[in-house]
Regions:
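Transmembrane-helix boundary motif in ABC transporter permease subunits
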Residues: 78-108
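Periplasmic/extracellular loop-to-transmembrane helix junction in inner-membrane transport proteins
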Residues: 6-11, 38-84
């Protein structure tokens, strides 16, 4: 009896965890529908949900949505690969080498405090308004969280573990592979997760620079023709893609940190 009750309670808890994240979005959707139907929200300011669904379906059937999503996704992932790769490499360098930290960290921290929007005029002068400018902005945005969390992760590895490994003859690459990297990995993946979200934020900024394709182009073009429903579709697309990126990051954490107590079965991710 106790076992049955425990199993039922666990199943109910899992069901609640699956439902709970959707309660706030559903409440907002209901409030949105009520607001537009009662006239509290003007359809010129925010169209009713049904109009947004119709606009989305029209974009899907015409193929326009998928074409623009593919372009934006390619830009985002390529920018993430470049910026994240450089951030990881420099984070490892400054974390492992005091000389590299002295030479690079101060400069990187100064650049980090420059707002991305302030860089746009300079980026246009450097790269023009083609794809290079967009990729640079995305790469710049994702670079810093990956760099900072990699650097912090390396520096926060327990020194006693390193000394213990050395006492057993573990040195060089083996020390890095079996002690330093596993110890730093949780922090590195936090940076990756944050960077995956920031990737889409930077892409929104980047695609306002005279884009000829992509979700940003679709949204800006709709704004010119006062197609508010299409603008909302574009915003929701960014939100969905950002959520998918976060789900991917969580999955990556569970797979690569399956040995960590916080990510084992039954632990809160």
């Amino acid at each position: 009896m106790t076992t049955t009750t425990s199993t039922t309670g666990a199943a109910a808890a899992r069901a609640w965890r699956g439902i709970a994240p959707w309660l706030v979005p559903l409440a907002l959707l209901v409030a949105w529908e009520i607001g537009t139907r009662t006239g509290w929200l003007s359809t010129r300011v925010l169209p009713e949900p049904v109009a947004v669904v119709r606009a989305a379906w029209s974009l899907v059937t015409s193929g326009e949505m998928w074409a623009n999503v593919k372009v934006s996704t390619w830009r985002a992932l390529l920018g993430f690969a470049v910026g994240g790769g450089v951030g990881l490499a420099l984070g490892l360098a400054t974390g492992l080498s005091k000389a590299a930290e002295v030479a690079l960290d101060s400069t990187i921290q100064m650049i980090r405090n420059i707002p991305a929007l302030a860089m746009i005029p300079l980026v246009i002068l450097w790269f023009g308004i083609d794809e290079k400018a967009k990729l640079f902005l995305v790469a710049l945005g994702v670079f810093f969280p990956v760099y900072i969390n990699t650097y912090h992760g390396i520096r926060s590895v327990d020194a006693s573990l390193i000394e213990m490994a050395k006492s057993y003859g573990v040195r060089g690459f083996a020390l890095y592979r079996h002690v330093i990297l596993p110890g730093a990995l949780p922090s590195i993946l936090v940076g990756v997760r944050f960077a995956l979200g920031l990737m889409w934020v930077m892409l929104i900024v980047a695609e306002t620079i005279s884009a000829q394709s992509g979700i940003g182009y679709m949204t800006m073009n709709a704004r010119e023709f006062l197609q508010t429903d299409v603008v909302v579709v574009g915003i929701l697309l960014y939100a969905v893609l950002g959520k998918l990126a976060d789900v991917l990051a969580k999955w990556l954490e569970r797979v690569t940190l399956c040995w960590h107590p916080a990510y084992q079965s039954g632990a809160k991710a």
